[in-house]
Amino acid sequence: MRELEEALRDWERYQRIPKKQFLQDRDTQNMVHHAMLLSIQSALDIATDVIAEERLRKPFTYRETFEVLAGEGIIPESLARDLSNLAGFRNVLVHIYWNLDLKQVYAILQHDLTVLRTFSVVMKEHVSESDSADPGGFF
């Protein structure tokens, strides 16, 4: 959880970068891409840890990871949809980085931090509840 929180603080700080600077400066783009990738990957890692710990159905794709949590009632369906979209974006960042739509990346930077913050809150609550029920529990 600590890794996610640190990455989200970076993401939040980078939201203050002016759009013009982001679109024109490759170093700024790389910095933002890295923070976004770490944030999304951290959320995926937390989700897969919960899936493994609770012996839930194994997802076939990163996008499906959050659907598994929603199917078990751990996160809301709407949050799972938004997180699945970010997982798809993560795949683009990793595999198609040379052909990114920078305006779309900037829009995600500005608007999707709340999705990951909500996930963090929900997962902290879930882990806390699980730890109460099973003191030998998570992370």
Outline where the language-model segments fall.
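Solvent-exposed interaction patches of small proteins and small membrane subunits
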Residues: 1-139
